[in-house]
Structures are given as structure tokens and as C-alpha cells.
Amino acid sequence: MGRSWGLALAAGERAGCVVSARGAERPGAEAEGPWSCSGVLLSRRAGLVLCHGGIVAPFLSAGAAALQPGAGPPFLGADSCRDDMRLHVQWGPGRGVGARAGRRGALCTPPCSARPAPRGQARARLLLLVCCPAFRASFARLFSGEAAEHWRFAGGGPEPQEPEADAGAGADEGPLLAALGWFALLSVEGRAEAAGGPWLSVAAAASLPKGAPLLACGSPFGAFCPDIFLNSLSRGVLSNAAGPLLLTDARCLPGTEGAGVFSADGALVALVAAPLCWRAREWVGLSLLCAADALLRAAAPALGRLGRHADARLLAALLPPDGGEPAAPLPELGAALVAAVLIECGSVWGSGVALAPHLVLTCRHVAPREAARVLVRPAIPKSSPVWGKVVFATQDTSPYDVAVLKLEEDLRGVPFPILASRFHEGEDVQVVGFGAFGQTCGPSVTSGILSAVVEGLSPATLETTAQGPPILT
């Protein structure tokens, strides 16, 4: 992508950690757990860690029902959990920018062998279990649609026991879903490091535009084999946002719940709330994030109400200033975000791109030849939908999945893209389309590369999970 990631890499390595929870051993009974997830060291010196609240849910005295919306206050103290809960935190060496790995061994030694081993586990105690109410409100708005559109999420605690017939059909209403939006603030006993460097800087999520580059630093599979997986990196972009609920196409795996997501300049933007999600049993290639600034704004006053005023002041000091300007669209994406349109054809909907004031290009399976009329909704705020009809569509047997719509009225204020004439394997591309969320929060942005270019032979296929959107270089 032609940019330097040094600051983000250093911040992620310095802040990344793994948190594990298990029950104490009792005579005649096996200990519960262990469960683990990723976390963020807000400061090694202060020993404060944020992680996903799902691993604490099994130890709640009132059960996971205490995390359900409307069940009680949006925060719980340490006394809400059983006394037999044991928490541990493991972190890496946290080399800074420009630091070099130690001398390698033989010439064939892989580069990862020069990486210092993770530190041993340190005991930690729970200070606060806090929910971000704004995140939960945005979550309810995005994911509480028609009953037929079942959503399922992975990550955030122990998997619920489900009947096989219900698997993947939205039956995930147990502790896993209840814990979405809940995060745990821990204190590491003995502090993480006596000279642990500066606190993290926290970015205002609203200041980042769609398409802004992001770097996720987490540990896939949690505490399983940290020598290999601790603080693994995944690069992506900010795909969309609904308040403090952010979506990214950075690839996150189970175990990265609670991982930090950083901007290119090394500021903490968000924590992973759910690494994987499905709609109607189809995987949606986006991860759910909770904005760090919104989470800290909820956690700081909650600590104060629990009498932990010193810790509350520490969190408040991390917050970015209020009242920042809304993010302006990225220059390379501004026109595409407006040129993308939502197309509704009966019960089917997809994306398209405006090529002229009265012409829209989309996929045949979105608007088939037999469709009498289709509704086109521009992405421009407060613009009116326009009716159109299919004037061209490839045959069902054709390898090309293309349809052209002629509109009854011209699209106003929509910039039209310049068509590319040359293509290069490996070049960066971005897709702007309405994806799985329709018009709820506008078009989404995903990033990738042009994997192959086929000329004069068979056409290439690109899977984007957003049928019909423009692909930009």
C-alpha cells in the first residue's frame, strides 16, 4: 500500500497481550476453563489491561444473563464474579521502532526464531466489567432486522451448547452474544514492567474516514501456542462505521477478541468485539470493532462510581479531545463513495455503479433480464430513489455476469468514474459497495489486490460479497 507501518507495528507489539481465565481447582471437581482472548496493555507501567468481557462471563455470580441489555447497569464491579476466578496476562517484549532482533543462528534459521519468547504469565485481578451502551445501540440497529436474516457471531467466550439443527441459524443468543460490547479492565499484579514506556495514544474513531488503513494486533486462538501466535498482525481498512461500532476487513480469527486495532500513526482506534460473523449461514468477511474512545468514556466514570478515582483519572487522560471535525472522505475514494448505488429488484438487492446520468452497471443476478422495473438508491444523503429498467443482461449461460440499467430520471450530483484501460497483477484495489448491510450505514469499503489478469482466455472471477460494486485502483 506504499505506506510506513513502523509506528503501528511498534504500538501493537508494545500493547498486545493474551488474557486467560480459569476456575481454581477444587477437591473432587475439575477446574473450569481455561478460556482466553487477546487484550491491550494500556500502560505497562500502570499495569492496566483491557480485554473482551466474554472470558469473565462464565464466572459471573448471576450468570451471563447479567450482561443482557436492560438486565442492570452498564458496568459491574469485581464482586460480581465468583471468588474462584483466576486471571493471567502474558505479553511480549515490546521492542520499539527501529529495534533489531537478536543475532540469528544458522543461515537456514527462519526469521521468526530471532523473535524473543513471550514473557511468563502474570496474575491479574478484575477491576471492572463495562459495556459500551452506544456500541450496543448501534449493534441493535444494524443486526436486528427481519427474522429470516439470522446473524451469528464467533468469539467472546465459551461457545454455547446448541442443538445441531439450530447451528448457524441465529440460535446464538447465549453468553457469547450477551457479552458483545462488554469489556474487562484488569490490573496486573506487580505491574507489567517497571519501565514500560509511554501510555498508548487513543484516536477518535469519528476522525477516521472509510477506507482508512488499520492494523490489527492480536493472538489467534488466544493462549494456544503464544510462541507462534502472540501479537500476530493483520492489515485492512475501516470498511464502515455506525457510531462506535466499526467494521474492518482486516482478517481476525477466534482468540483475537479484545485485540487492539491501530491507525497508521500508531494510535489505538478500537478493540475487536467479534472476529467472525455470518448472515443466513454465509460468512461475512468483516470483523466487528468497538471504538476505543467510546469504550474509555464509558469505563472512566464507571470506575469513579466504584470508588476507583485514581484509575478513572488515568483512563480519562487517554481520551482524545471532544468535538473533533467529522472525517472527510479519502481523496481516492470520495467519488466512488458517491457513484456506488444500491439496487433493489423485488426481494433481491445488490450494488451498482453509475456510468452516466441515466445508466447504471451491475450484475445480471442482481437485476436479471426478466425484471420489469428496479429501484436505484443513490448513496448521496437525502437523494431520492430512481426507477429504472434492465436494457441489457448477459445470458444465464454466459461467463460474464453483467447487466445495464436505464433510469427513468437522471442521477443528479453523482460523479462518474474513469474506466481503467490497463490492469496489473498485484496492484492494490478497493471495492465500494453496500455489502451485507444494505443502506443502513451507507456503502462499505474493502481492500485487496488484483490477483490475476486473464486476457483472451477465460474471464477471471472476483469474489467481494457485494454484488455489482465498482472496483477501484
Model-inferred region functions:
Residues 1-76:
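Conserved, well-structured beta-alpha core segment at the onset of a catalytic domain
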Residues 1-35, 303-347:
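Protease-domain processing segments flanking chymotrypsin-fold serine proteases, especially trypsin-like
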Residues 11, 16, 33, 56, ...:
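Serine endopeptidase catalytic core focused on the charge-relay Asp
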Residues 25-53, 258, 338-357, 363, ...:
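A conserved glycine-rich beta-strand in the N-terminal activation segment of trypsin-fold
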Residues 37, 202-203, 247, 328, ...:
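A structural connector/turn signal
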Residues 40-41, 249-272, 353, 450, ...:
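Catalytic nucleophile loop of clan PA
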Residues 44-47, 211, 261-269, 358, ...:
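A glycine-centered beta-loop-beta connector
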Residues 262-325, 333:
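C-terminal subregion of chymotrypsin/trypsin-like serine protease catalytic domains
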